Amino acid sequence: MQVYAVGGAIRDELLGKPSQDRDYVVVGATPADMEAAGYKPVGKDFPVFLHPRTKEEYALARTERKTAMGYKGFAFYCEPDVTLDDDLVRRDLTINAMARAVDDDGKLVGPVIDPHGGQRDLAARQFRHVSEAFAEDPVRILRVARFAARFHDFTVAPETVALMRRMVDAGEVDALVPERVWQELARGLMEARPARMFEVLRQCGALARLLPELDRLWGVPQRADYHPEVDTGVHVMMVIDCAAAMGTTLAVRFAALVHDLGKGTTPEHVLPRHLGHETRSVELLEDVCKRLRVPNDCRDLAVVVAREHGNIHRSMEFGAAAITRLLERCDALRKPGRFADALLACEADKRGRKGFESDTYPQKARLLAALDAAASVDAGAIAKALADDVSKIRERVHEARVAAVDARLKQLADH
């Protein structure tokens, strides 16, 4: 049997980028051969084995045949007569359909095996499908979009965009399970330029099917004095790229993505103003989270940011009482980490505008100082002192927090 490293490891080597892991394909072997060599079987859908020493995954070379819609609708053939080229031709993109032989020590040996022009497309910075079999797996649309967020100087070949459009028109993306859609979107959000992912999804029409709430933001105007970029979709893309450049978590980037969804449903006669869009954004993002089964931490932060980002932006004008109410609405005293993340999303929102990319965000330091002051109030001691009149506990705790925040704001003003 012959072992080859395939896919991303070869692509990244040619690009001079580190590769986190390798995919291995074994040609000319049966499952019995693999087990006899000490490999442990782990694959459910097709034969995959763990190396006895490194525990890396090795898959038998295989071909695929489409049997139903969706990404699970495949039958696999994994016999010793399947060649390396048979295996490579089923892969998504030419840049992922290259291989190199691997010796007994796990080292890459020999030339790059490139039957489909992957090196040519790497040089041209282009994503191109290997064959029409690309159309059999709708996850590949999401993967191409995600790769665009990682390799953001690449473009999608026109014929590949056209094929992706045909897949969308045929309803293939509608058959994707929500968990897989979220998984790919989440991975793309964590890349260097997540906006590129959504640009590619729009380009082929997939965004309108997967996230219509986001897709409808393009073409919706905002006030040019606040948003020189005007277009709401453009603004949101600037915000998520800013959040990525800040090195934020997935929850922050998702909150940045969905914070303005309500602007897509603003009545035309009030444009470019968007009064009440915060409430509409919360309703829409909750629908998105339910549909895609978004994790609770991402959903909860997104709700806080969508509902309160306008107040957080205006908080430099707020006194102690208004700031304390804001902290309490955000549950900042019980969840200070989430509140700090909300401030990061709001900072990205402010800087994600044409001409404002390098702005500072003094609201963040002021609100964190206010939170520190409010947290210094001993609510337990107040409750103990009012044990005979518990109805006043919440009011007195709130008053004490306002006083503490007021004192801290005066200190900041003096400095």
Curated annotation (Swiss-Prot):
Protein name: Multifunctional CCA protein
Keyword Protein biosynthesis listed: no
GO biological process: RNA repair; tRNA 3'-terminal CCA addition
PANTHER family for this protein: MULTIFUNCTIONAL CCA PROTEIN
Gene assigned in the entry: cca
Assembly and binders: Monomer. Can also form homodimers and oligomers.
Top-rank taxon: Bacteria
Protein residues bound to Mg(2+): 21, 23
Pfam families: HD, PolyA_pol, PolyA_pol_RNAbd
Signal peptide: none
Stretches assigned to the HD domain: 232-333
Cofactor(s) named in the record: Mg(2+); Ni(2+)
Family according to the record: Belongs to the tRNA nucleotidyltransferase/poly(A) polymerase family. Bacterial CCA-adding enzyme type 1 subfamily.
Miscellaneous comment text of the record: A single active site specifically recognizes both ATP and CTP and is responsible for their addition.
HAMAP family referenced in this protein's UniProt entry, alphabetically: CCA_bact_type1
Record InterPro entries: CCA_bact (IPR012006), HD/PDEase_dom (IPR003607), HD_domain (IPR006674), NT_sf (IPR043519), PolA_pol_head_dom (IPR002646), PolyA_RNA-bd (IPR032828), tRNA_CCA-adding_enzyme (IPR050124)
UniProt comment concerning the protein's domains: Comprises two domains: an N-terminal domain containing the nucleotidyltransferase activity and a C-terminal HD domain associated with both phosphodiesterase and phosphatase activities.
PROSITE patterns documented for this protein: HD
GO molecular function, one term: cyclic-nucleotide phosphodiesterase activity
Cofactor annotation remark: Magnesium is required for nucleotidyltransferase activity. Nickel for phosphatase activity.
Positions annotated to bind ATP: 8, 11, 91, 143, 146
